[in-house]
Amino acid sequence: MNRLDIEKKLNEDRAWLLNTYAALTDDQLRADLTPSEHNPQNFWSALDHLAHLALIERNFAAMIRKHIAGDANPVGLRVDDNGVARSTEQIMASVHAMTEEWQITHHGKSLSEVVALGASARAVTLQLLSDLSDVQLEEVLPGAPWADGTVGGVLAANADHGRMHWKWVKDARLQRH
């Protein structure tokens, strides 16, 4: 994916996501919707789903920076730092624990505060995009299961991630009525 397409996708989908969330009432933003994958007793709200996107966007940028710096295992999901393979169950347990910690930390924030989290993460992504060469955007990010696995594809996947979480929010809201 080329630089222009990545930036357009990120900006257009971010604007769509902000408009979509802005159309919700405060009650709709804060209502318990989906059970946590880590602790099913804990429920995520629409705002929790929106805040989660900032965590993953920052993590993607950190993985890409590690790759550019020469780290052989920049994603660090499939194998640990010692090169030992992780099972899918181990990977998902680790990911769910990390996202749960983030959700608990940011639960209860206002829409404005959550939008600021996302803006900060997006700024990191756009700065990284501006720092990377066209050749680097086409490099494979070792261990990345997202998009086409390239650096550019992973950056652009942030847009798809937002739409995926919105679908979960929308579906959960429909089930409640």
Describe these PLM feature segments.
Residues 1-20:
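Extreme N-terminal tail/first-helix region
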Residues 5, 9, 52, 117, ...:
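Short, contiguous, pocket-lining structural segments
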Residues 9, 104-120:
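A short, structured beta-strand-centered segment in the mid-to-C-terminal lobe
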Residues 12, 16, 117-120, 124:
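Charged, amphipathic alpha-helical oligomerization/scaffolding segments
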Residues 12, 16, 28-38:
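Charge-rich, low-complexity N-terminal segments
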Residues 24-29, 110, 133:
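Residues that cap or delimit alpha-helices
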Residues 32-93, 123-177:
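Short, contiguous alpha-helical
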Residues 37-38, 98-106:
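A short small-residue
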